[in-house]
């Protein structure tokens, strides 16, 4: 796996090794910081509804992505371990936030559907997520945000091509 130091060399960035190491460390820490900050912002809501973070993440994933409705979808798309998905789905069912529904034509496939009981936490969770994103992009002008998303889209397209070619 390429690390940021090699990426800076490949991209012909004119920086020192010390600067590359600094970028590498911040690149590694970046995802961790986002996760820590998001979890920290979620704590009051989790406490209010007495839910663990993983159960909340699963509920919000189902609410925000109606095209994904199964435990397998959660495992594959959200990369949450199957045993954690199973335990937390059971909890969400017991708490009345979701129901299980067999898929017509395929008894082996079970859909997970948010219930009206989940509406309040979903509404508050979506507001929390929207506010969190707003805070992430504070002090960034529109041009910087646009460049960021254009760059991310291009990287995603390049990754798709690499995966397709190999």
Residue ranges and their predicted role:
Residues 71, 75, 111, 157, ...:
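Alpha-helical transmembrane segments and membrane-interface helix-loop junctions
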Residues 1-21, 143-166:
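C-terminal regulatory/oligomerization modules of transcriptional regulators
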Residues 14, 91-149:
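Charged, amphipathic alpha-helical coiled-coil/dimerization segments
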């Amino acid at each position: 796996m390429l690390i940021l130091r090699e990426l800076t060399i490949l991209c012909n960035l004119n920086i020192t090794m010390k600067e590359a190491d600094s970028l590498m460390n911040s690149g590694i820490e970046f995802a961790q910081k986002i996760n820590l900050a998001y979890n920290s912002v979620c704590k009051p809501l989790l406490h209010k509804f007495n839910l663990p973070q993983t159960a909340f993440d699963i509920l919000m994933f189902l609410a925000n992505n109606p095209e994904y409705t199964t435990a397998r979808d959660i495992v594959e798309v959200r990369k949450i371990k199957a045993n954690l998905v199973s335990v937390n789905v059971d909890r969400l069912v017991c708490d009345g936030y979701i129901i299980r529904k067999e898929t017509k034509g395929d008894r082996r496939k079970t859909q997970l559907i948010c219930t009206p009981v989940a509406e309040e936490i979903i509404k508050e969770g979506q507001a929390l997520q929207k506010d969190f994103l707003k805070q992430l992009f504070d002090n960034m002008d529109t041009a910087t945000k646009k460049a960021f998303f254009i760059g991310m889209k291009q990287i995603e397209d390049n990754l798709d091509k690499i995966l397709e070619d190999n």
